[in-house]
Regions:
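N-terminal pre-catalytic "stem/leader" segment of glycosyltransferase-like enzymes
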Residues: 1-96
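Active-site proximal beta-strand in glycosyltransferases
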Residues: 83-90, 101-123
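Short, conserved loop/helix-junction motifs that constitute active-site signature segments
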Residues: 100-107, 133-142, 193
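Nucleotide-sugar donor phosphate/pyrophosphate-binding loop at the beta->alpha transition
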Residues: 119-138, 184
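A short, active-site helix/loop in glycosyltransferases that binds the activated sugar's phosphate group
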Residues: 130, 134, 138-175
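Short beta-strand->alpha-helix junction loop in the catalytic core
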Residues: 170-188
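Conserved donor-binding/catalytic core segment of Leloir-type glycosyltransferases
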Residues: 182-200
Length: 200
């Protein structure tokens, strides 16, 4: 059974990220993976600074996840052929996972979902575009596949990040539009029986 390390985005109840936290491990297991969830340590359970996530908390959460990943490599607990699935590719340090695998002479697959970033001018992190435009391309280069929720995100990333840096030919095939994953178990069917309506 292949090993999959699930590196979740913070599971906030008011966001779909809580659904992902519950449902992705089960989905990966049913696909035949041995799943290990690498939880982070949040500072907040609500958004105080930022919009989609609390920026202070998300940086802390992801840095504690990265520390655990480094420890797993150090302890030789990452089997060759492992998969790392990141619930948020906007993960400062994701390129370190590629380096850890290379330096430990392990073949791993790094993949995940990119919600938004400085490349989406409507995003709170658009303020980081002067420097994050380079790290975003680095994140994609470190990954084998990056999923995005819409054609808008696919084209925005290509047009605002890859093409200006001359990286489109090499990296665009790593971007894949999937839509935002939803799980049927979160949306129970409501019985809406058909009835004759009498209009008076």
């Amino acid at each position: 059974m292949p090993q999959l390390f699930y590196v979740p985005i913070e599971p906030l109840v008011e966001r779909y990220t809580e659904s992902w936290y519950r449902n992705f491990p089960t989905t990966f297991r049913s696909a035949g993976f041995d799943v290990t969830v690498i939880d982070g340590v949040p500072l907040e359970d609500e958004v105080k600074v930022g919009t989609f996530l609390d920026v202070n908390s998300t940086v802390h959460y992801k840095s504690t996840q990265l520390a655990q990943i480094a420890a797993l490599f150090n302890q030789r607990r990452v089997p060759n052929g492992s998969v790392f699935f990141f619930g948020d590719v906007e993960f400062w340090g994701i390129e370190s996972v590629r380096l850890l695998a290379q330096m430990n002479r392990l073949d791993v697959t790094i993949t995940g979902f990119l919600h938004a970033g400085s490349y989406t001018i409507e995003d709170a992190f658009a303020v980081a575009a002067p420097y994050q435009q380079y790290t975003e391309v680095g994140w994609l280069a470190a990954c084998d596949r990056v999923y995005v929720g819409s054609d808008y995100h696919y084209h925005a990333f290509r047009e605002r990040r890859l093409i200006p840096l001359g990286a489109d030919d090499n990296l665009r095939s790593r971007l894949m539009v999937t839509g935002n994953p939803l799980f049927k178990s979160d949306y129970p069917l409501v019985d809406v029986s058909k009835r004759n309506k009498v209009v008076l």
